Amino acid sequence: MFPPSGSTGLIPPSHFQARPLSTLPRMAPTWLSDIPLVQPPGHQDVSERRLDTQRPQVTMWERDVSSDRQEPGRRGRSWGLEGSQALSQQAEVIARQLQELRRLEEEVRLLRETSLQQKMRLEAQAMELEALARAEKAGRTEAEGLRAALAGAEVIRKNLEEGSQRELEEVQRLHQEQLSSLTQAHEEALSSLTSKAEGLEKSLSSLETRRAGEAKELAEAQREAELLRKQLSKTQEDLEAQVTLVENLRKYVGEQVPSEVHSQTWELERQKLLETMQHLQEDRDSLQATVELLQVRVQSLTHILALQEEELTRKVQPSDSLEPEFTRKCQFLLNRWREKVFALMVQLKAQELEHSDSVKQLKGQVASLQEQVTSQSQEQAILQRSLQDKAAEVEVERIGAKGLQLELSRAQEARHRWQQQTASAEEQLRLVVNAVSSSQIWLETTMAKVEEAAAQLPSLNNRLSYAVRKVHTIRGLIARKLALAQLRQESCPLPPPVADVSLELQQLREERNRLDAELQLSARLIQQEVGRAREQGEAERQQLSKVAQQLEQELQQTQESLASLGLQLEVARQGQQESTEEAASLRQELTQQQELYGQALQEKVAEVETQLREQLSDTERRLNEARREHAKAVVSLRQIQRRAAQEKERSQELRRLQEEARKEEGQRLARRLQELERDKNLMLATLQQEGLLSRYKQQRLLTVLPSLLDKKKSVVSSPRPPECSASAPIAAAVPTRESIKGSLSVLLDDLQGLSEAISKEEAVCQGDNLDRCSSSNPQMSS
């Protein structure tokens, strides 16, 4: 026995307890904690891969353990080798158990997959059964629809018969209504024509009254124009007389008055004349405005004839006393021209009235014919619409027959499809029966496998319990060996390196504690996995039993549904035969009805065609008559238009000749006026040369200044001294100047009156020039 090395008595049990691990690399492998309790089938491959990757970790851990065991020294190799062998055996046992667990998991996954496939097959079979039920319902509904279509065809046939009778009655009623409406329209047209004739007569009377009023207004306007012409001629004569007086006075004043007095008087006269000119310009503006207003009034009241007459009267003035024959000729020509124009106007008015009457008559005839044509076209449209309605009804009947034929064809197609569906349903039922039998066999085999696995579970439990006991024994042996090794170390002399021994002890203790923890953890994990496998197997067994029961129930239901489907197929076949027979009878009835309706429609169409032909012949006859009357009216209108055009051409030719004559007369009068002005200028020049004007001025001065002449004589006869002989002419000159001043005041008054007359004359001359310009403008335009 080795003596104790420092401590007396027995070793306490706390010495063999597990201590906290201090180093991380000597911990148990982490792959044991990563194993799931129940792995789904989708993640089994992942778990297998994880285990495959963790196997080298186990080997590495074993190597580490073996290397750790070799480190302490030669003294503890014997018990370390024994512990490593035991651990390797335990690891092999654990690996075998893990392989068995994997195999069980694979079997469970296969069972789940097969159960899912069976569920899918059963669901597909249920869907097929539902489709068969739907097809059966569709066949029933189609049979009911065929029956309803047959009933509807009978109702349509009855409705068509009733509709044909109603249409005949409506056609008769419409014919009577059309006749009554035509008579009413004819009466209304007659009444409207009479009312139109009365209105036209009233309008004619009103037009005649208007024409009479316009003639009166024209006569009044002509009278006013003649008065204005007379006034203008008088004013022109007065102006000419005043112009001559003014010229004479100017000449007299220029000869008698000296230069200085003449300049002073001239300035005064110029100022007064400027003032008078301003007044005269204002008066002239007002007179021009009044003259323009009068001209507008004359132009609005009179026609082109009045303007031409006015021009002729203006050109031929009564003051022209040198050519009385020319004035008489102009007056005679003007009167003849007036008479011709009046006759032409009367003829044109009569022709216009006749033309308007004929046009109104023709318009009335055309309107009546148009009304007749519109009424006949309406009748024709009504008949055409009735024909279209009947044709539409026939088409509707044809469409209904086509629809029935289509329904029959659809029914046949549905029957054919029903037969195909029944055949396919029978085949599917056979397939379902085979699939159910095969699935039942497979379930039985899987249940046997599951029972075998459940029978193997107690043996596995025994193995696990044996392994746990073995682990406990190994743990006790290891503890005993460790205690013995410690006693030996204590009894042995201390080696020189105390630190190495203490380190080895700590490492051994740590390794012991780690191995204990690993063994406990592995035992716990194995127990958990076994419990999970048991629970999973029992749950899957229960599920499979439930699925088997459900499949048996579904098989019973499918067999029952197959039996009912067979009965329904027989019923459907019988109904199909009945429907085919009914369809054949309906086809025969439809052909008969089509023949009857075709005959009736042909008869109706023939009657309507005869009526329409008669009406068309009547309308054509009336249209031909209307066309003839219209052609006659057009011919008469063209004749009237030709006459009117000829008369218009004649009137235009007359106007052109009259204008040419008037232009020639105007030119001749202008030349005559120029000659008269030239003669007047010559007369004035001769008078000035002979001194007649100076004599008139002297006589005027003598009459104005008698007193001055008397005084002059007294002064000349009185004795004068010789001293005053030189001042005598000066004294004589003074009274002559004073007398000249008085005579000048009188002359200025006269000149004011003459200037006023001259301004009036100039205004009148300007108005005449404006009238001539206005008269020349329409002549140029014409």
Curated annotation (Swiss-Prot):
A Pfam family recorded for this sequence: HCR
Basic and acidic residues composition bias: residue spans: 62-74, 208-218
Keyword list, A-Z: Coiled coil, Cytoplasm, Developmental protein, Differentiation, Nucleus
Region (Disordered): 62-82, 191-218
Location within or outside the cell: Cytoplasm; Nucleus
Coiled coil: 82-314, 344-435, 498-691
Gene Ontology annotations of biological process type: cell differentiation; protein export from nucleus
UniProt name for this protein: Coiled-coil alpha-helical rod protein 1
Source organism per UniProt: Pongo pygmaeus
